[in-house]
Amino acid sequence: MLVWHPVRLIAVSLRNKTIILGAIPVVASAVALSLTEIPGTSVDLSVPYAAEGPGPTFNTLGTTGGKNVVDISGTKTYPTSGHLNMTTVSVRHGMSLPQAITRWATTNDMLVPIEQIFPANQSPEEVNKENQAAFASSENNATSAAMKYLHRPMAVTVMSQPEGFDEIRKGDIIEGIDGKKIAQPQDLVKAVRSHKVGDRVTLQVQRDGKSQDVSVPVRQGESDDAPILGITIKQEPADGTTIDYHLDDIGGPSAGLMFTLAVVDKLTPEDLTDGKFIAGTGTIDADGGVGPIGGVSHKIDAAKKAGATMFMTPSDNCAEAMSGDHDGVVLAKVNNLSDAVTALKEVKAGKEPK
């Protein structure tokens, strides 16, 4: 299973290649040793640990399954070269004791308590759902951050509305609320939450190319009783540009930075990588801020194995990144999207990124 959500690595390294296997009484067959439950029962024999290690990397400038990983249409794009690889952490769980010992002894994986992957109050399905939502959010933020960096207009668009909610329609562009401009979804959420359930607000919307005012009721949220409108909104390019992301079976927010750089590279005449193999990680917010992630040492290891010569790491992950083995890979510290683009330009010019 590949995950992207931040997880705190176990404080003590579990890597000691000298294992005294004679201290472990081995009395069962190899088949029995690999069992994770007693046959014919629901008794779980798996250890309460997961193994974390380097996962696969994906070139956000490349293709997967015959599709561009980052696919842009509706506007002029420019040729790219090289690599901007997002990196992953591979997580294995549901292991028997011998399987866990084998991974501990023969790989660079680290064992972490299973609760760090699947909290006690959440099922694997719930965690996976959260990871998928975080991944989708990273895609949306990547689009917003890239378009803002390139000074291209964005719009808050209605994606869906409750049944019977006829005041607002799918495809409406929300320009303002009660006369105040809406620049991003958070602006609308904040404005609505300043009202009480049952109030009415006036939205300034653009529908079929025409602006109009629409009065809508403030509803009560189902999960936290907070005031809401009940509509699903998304920030999209306002100039007809469409940006789609094509990676399946990946979860979590840490692909955001590399997705954003791919969008910027494809929409910029200048080739940002100059054919070089760059990898990295980091969350991205809609304003271009880069946030920390989990498993950075594993991701650097994955990048090295893939052939990267530079790795972009969030500033908050620098201490861990520097403490590990990164020989042959230049580390670039980034706080925001502008830092990341600057680092690419410095490497292109033959300089070492700051």
What annotation goes with each model-predicted range?
Residues 1-16, 105-113:
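Terminal targeting segments of Actinobacterial cell-envelope proteins
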Residues 35-111, 346-354:
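Extracytoplasmic low-complexity, Pro/Thr/Ser/Ala/Gly-rich segments
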Residues 266, 286-311:
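Glycine- and Gly-Pro-enriched alpha-helical subdomains that act as flexible
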Residues 17-37:
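Hydrophobic membrane-insertion alpha-helices, especially the h-region
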